[in-house]
Curated annotation (Swiss-Prot):
Coiled coil: none annotated. The gene is benK. Residues 1-22, 82-93, 141-150, 203-258, 319-325, 370-387, 436-466 are cytoplasmic. GO terms for molecular function: carboxylic acid transmembrane transporter activity. One of its GO terms (cellular component) is plasma membrane. Residues 44-60, 115-119, 172-181, 280-297, 347-348, 409-414 are periplasmic. Belongs to the major facilitator superfamily. Aromatic acid:H(+) symporter (AAHS) (TC 2.A.1.15) family. This is Benzoate transport protein. The chain crosses the membrane at residues 23-43, 61-81, 94-114, 120-140, 151-171, 182-202, 259-279, 298-318, 326-346, 349-369, 388-408, 415-435. It is a multi-pass membrane protein. Keywords: Cell inner membrane, Cell membrane, Membrane, Transmembrane, Transmembrane helix, Transport. PANTHER family: CARBOXYLIC ACID TRANSPORTER PROTEIN HOMOLOG (PTHR23508:SF10). Probable uptake of benzoate.
Length: 466
């Protein structure tokens, strides 16, 4: 008589092991590549505008091209990853395709000789960048113990800020010496690391169970739950909501009275992405306009991403102990205050602190929203929900650089530029508050192991001793 082993429940109840850290470190590395490729446009922008005689409005549109690609990437790759598993296209393969796409096209940007060529490659790179995010989030969420889910997702996405910090730091050293193209050449490193990375990154556990790859599942479960002892009568199963993931349509993210909250997630991401990409693309130029040189302006961008990393990790830690909604709202409030204060004149040290706070708020709140969605949606629609949230919210990312370029073209006093950027933070507080947590996914309270033909509950501590 067979005994069912619910792998999702065992992972939810597991304690942290080296295998968990392997998943989070490798996933964070992917997001570091992602963040670097996205931020380097802001690093190169001052020299690009000078070399190609680009006006602020045109520069804003070029900056939004990659974000437009990210919208398509998130919508396409976020959705098809939940549908293609029955064709043998695993989530890890989708991630690999996205890495190749954004790395190769970013390198090709460095060989561009016209704004048209540059824009085409930035768009294609954006498709890859946008596609990798929902799939890596879904992968990490599958392997994260329940009490660490928010922390794992936000820790992983602190890699975006690390990538931005790396781009800003290297840019402050290399760009004045070698020009802007060197930054795009460095983006080819993921292509070299791809094969070893894919070899050690585990496949989606849900995919492995559905495909009956029992030997691999058994190996992973013994790594994640060392006390688990496999028996020949054990049969690996998933939560009922995970079983038919490949057949999950987009409409499911609107069902069970989730439609309004789904729309509020979209609006919240829209607001945070306006801030993230307006600052990420234009902060060096804004600080140059305020009277700082190129190297120092790039250090301000470095400070923004340092704040983003701290805000992401701290926010994830707090979200697993308190309400993720109010942690996100608190970060947005910090953003509204710090961006408003940037409108005034302060010493460089105070400016660094305020910009770091703005990074914690904008980047941190954006990443908190991704962790929020990972908890809100059931596993069978998680990648779809996150992908569509990122895709629809990308409209804000697209508008952010364009609107900031338009603001600069008006040549308004420095005061108004940052004051305008604080408005999305205020609106974001409202939209996050309106998300209905009563519609959040609740996994069924079942034992990790039960008799397939007997519904009698087996105690959890017995699950690892049979």
């Amino acid at each position: 008589m067979s005994r069912e082993i619910n792998v999702n429940q065992m992972i939810d109840d597991s304690k942290l092991t080296p295998f968990h850290w392997r998943v989070i470190i490798l996933s964070t590395l992917i997001i570091i590549f992602d963040g670097y490729d996205l931020v380097i446009y802001g690093v190169a922008l001052p020299l690009l505008m000078k070399e190609w005689a680009i006006d602020p409005v045109t520069a804003g549109f070029i900056g939004s091209i990659a974000l437009f690609g990210m919208m398509f990437g998130a919508l396409i790759f976020g959705t098809i990853a939940d549908k293609l598993e029955h064709l043998g296209v695993s989530r890890k393969k989708v991630i690999a395709v996205c890495i190749i796409l954004f790395s190769l096209c970013t390198v090709l940007c460095g060989f561009s000789e016209t704004t048209t060529q540059f824009s085409i490659f930035r768009f294609l790179a954006g498709v890859g960048i946008g596609g990798v995010m929902p799939n890596v989030i879904a992968l990490v969420s599958e392997y994260a113990p329940k009490k660490f889910k928010s922390f794992f997702v936000t820790l992983m996405f602190s890699g975006y800020a690390i990538g931005g910090m790396t781009a800003a730091f290297l840019g402050s050293i290399l760009v004045p010496l070698y020009g802007w193209k060197i930054m795009f050449m460095i983006a080819g490193i993921p292509l070299v690391l791809l094969l070893p990375l894919m070899k050690v990154l585990p496949e989606s556990i849900d995919y492995l169970v559905r495909k009956k790859k029992d030997e691999t599942v058994r190996f992973i479960m013994t790594k994640m739950v060392p006390s688990y002892q496999y028996q020949p009568d054990h049969v690996f199963v998933l939560n009922s909501s995970n079983q038919n993931q490949a057949q999950a349509p987009v409409k499911m993210i609107f069902q069970e009275q989730r439609a309004f909250s789904t729309m509020m997630f979209w609006c919240s991401i829209f607001m945070t992405l306006i801030m993230v990409y307006a600052l990420g693309n234009w902060l060096p130029k804004l600080m140059i306009e305020a009277g700082y040189n190129l190297s120092k302006s790039l250090i301000f961008l470095f400070s923004l991403n340092v704040g983003g990393m701290i805000g992401s990790i701290l926010g994830g830690y707090l979200a697993d102990r308190y309400n993720v909604k109010f942690v996100t709202m608190g970060l947005l409030l910090l953003g509204a205050i710090s961006l408003s204060l940037l409108s005034f004149q302060f010493s460089s040290v105070i400016l660094y602190i305020l910009i770091a706070c703005a990074g914690a708020a904008s980047i941190g709140a954006q990443i908190m929203l991704l962790a929020y969605m990972a908890k809100f949606y059931a596993p069978n629609v998680r990648s779809t929900g996150i992908g569509w949230g990122l895709g629809m919210g990308r409209v804000g990312a697209i508008l952010g650089p364009i609107l900031t370029g338009w603001l600069l073209s008006l040549q308004l006093p420095h005061f108004y530029n940052f004051l305008a950027l604080s408005i999305p933070a205020v609106l974001g507080i409202v939209t996050v508050f309106l998300i209905n947590d009563r519609r959040m996914y609740q996994p069924e309270p079942i034992s990790p192991i039960a008799n397939q033909n007997d519904t009698t509950t087996v105690k959890v501590n017995e699950a690892v001793s049979h």
